[in-house]
Amino acid sequence: MSFTVVIPARYQSTRLPGKPLADIAGKPMVQWVYEQAIQAGAQDVIIATDDQRVADAVAVFGGKVCMTSPNHESGTERLAEVVQLMGIADDHIVVNVQGDEPLIPPSIIRQVAENLAASSAPMATLGVAITSEEEVFNPNAVKVVTDKEGYALYFSRATIPWDRDAFARGEVLTEHSLMRHIGIYAYRAGFINTYVNWQPSSLEKIECLEQLRVLWYGEKIHVELAKEAPPAGVDTPEDLELVRELIAAKS
């Protein structure tokens, strides 16, 4: 099985300007993500950016860049442009890895690609069991419910499924673990253009979850439990400092 990883790397960030180039142990953040994707066994790793400063930094460490429009409204639109510009075949598997996850385990990058290859869905993703009471009711921890074959029934910021009896007894964490969605996706390349040409659905607008568009239009997303739980990504200066400390502790 071969697959390509695309890493969106926008320079502009409200909470952390210049995020892709933030220094972590002497390397820009985007290089850490790139190296994790290489370790996952990707046939090709492409960094998608709309900023020449990012492109120049990637050239220094020998990565491949695809310059994209600065006017995309979503990461999926940027991904569709990469597929078109790079001439990626419709049946090829493309994994979208966020550019702010320098510690993402290579194992789950490969796992989501293998998950898609083994299913009939046009799209696949991963989840982890929720083990924290705080996450059960946290709207920032997106929940996913699947059918018996692992296909997503729904994604929500709400607590789903609602364990009526256990919650009534004050039991938040039960044997029926809720699943938290991890924001890593694999696509069949030809499906990406279909996806971005659909009109946004009312459900995705309500939940602010773009993946609900796929379910709204009757397509499937396959979900597996991740082999490893990835560390949190970098959204703030505090997150960046934590990652620096974690990497320093390992070296």
From Swiss-Prot:
E.C. code: 2.7.7.38
Which coarse location class applies to the principal site listed for this UniProt protein? Answer: cytoplasm
Pathway where this protein functions: Nucleotide-sugar biosynthesis; CMP-3-deoxy-D-manno-octulosonate biosynthesis; CMP-3-deoxy-D-manno-octulosonate from 3-deoxy-D-manno-octulosonate and CTP: step 1/1; Bacterial outer membrane biogenesis; lipopolysaccharide biosynthesis
Known catalysed reaction(s)?
3-deoxy-alpha-D-manno-oct-2-ulosonate + CTP = CMP-3-deoxy-beta-D-manno-octulosonate + diphosphate
Going by the entry's taxonomy, the superkingdom of the source organism is recorded as Bacteria
Q: Where in the cell?
A: Cytoplasm
Cystine pairs annotated here are: none
Similarity comment text for this entry = Belongs to the KdsB family.
Per its database record, what is this protein's job?
Answer: Activates KDO (a required 8-carbon sugar) for incorporation into bacterial lipopolysaccharide in Gram-negative bacteria.
- This chain's protein is named 3-deoxy-manno-octulosonate cytidylyltransferase
Upper classification of the source organism reads: Bacteria, Pseudomonadati, Pseudomonadota, Gammaproteobacteria, Vibrionales
Q: Which gene codes for it?
A: kdsB
